[in-house]
Amino acid sequence: TELTYAIPTHNPLDPPQMIKNMGLIRNGLISLPIGRMDLIPDHYEIIDKRLNVPVDFPEFKFELRQSQKDVYDEIEDNAIINAWVSWGKTFTGLAIAGKLGQKTLVVTHTVPLRNQWAKEVKKVFGIEAGIIGSGRFELDAPIVIGNTQTLYRNIDKIRKEFGTIILDEMHHVSSPTFSKILDTNYCRYKIGLSGT
């Protein structure tokens, strides 16, 4: 069964864009978007298989600006943080990772973004991030940063390793590769960051 709905367009001549809300992963198992529990028929049994993978984070070394602190204080579960360029999404995302206390996978779509995240991890926590990509496959750090393509190729090795996933530039999540990484992962928390 699939549930879809049309997104209204501004131009009545444009075809409607469709959003797929429910997909069959395999017999007896469906995938729903986060926050759409209203789509689950009453006769379905919900089995939550999300994983907690607690780790000890070093102390976060910096103070958040008030707008960042407001977001940080609000987040207790899955969230999307949509803020302007230079607001400090990376910085705030790392603070939230520390707050949630779960082994964290940061998903990036470029090597420069992955490297930027690794520098920020070192700066704010004083630790080296694990890297997945460029011939490296390091899973032992509290925070691991990986490129989408490499994560996709290693999807079976990472699906039960993390308690939190942070999606940088999450507006790319509509790509099949990005979606597959999310849909097959057992992490407890999913945090999306976007500037668009």
Predicted regions and their residues:
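Conserved helix-turn-beta segment of the N-terminal RecA-like "Helicase ATP-binding" lobe
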Residues: E2-A6, V111-R136
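Interdomain "pre-motor" coupling segment immediately N-terminal to P-loop NTPase/helicase cores
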Residues: E2-L51
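Conserved pre-motif I regulatory segment
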Residues: L24, I46-N82
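Hydrophobic positions in the central parallel beta-sheet of the AAA+
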Residues: I81, V106, V144-G146, I165
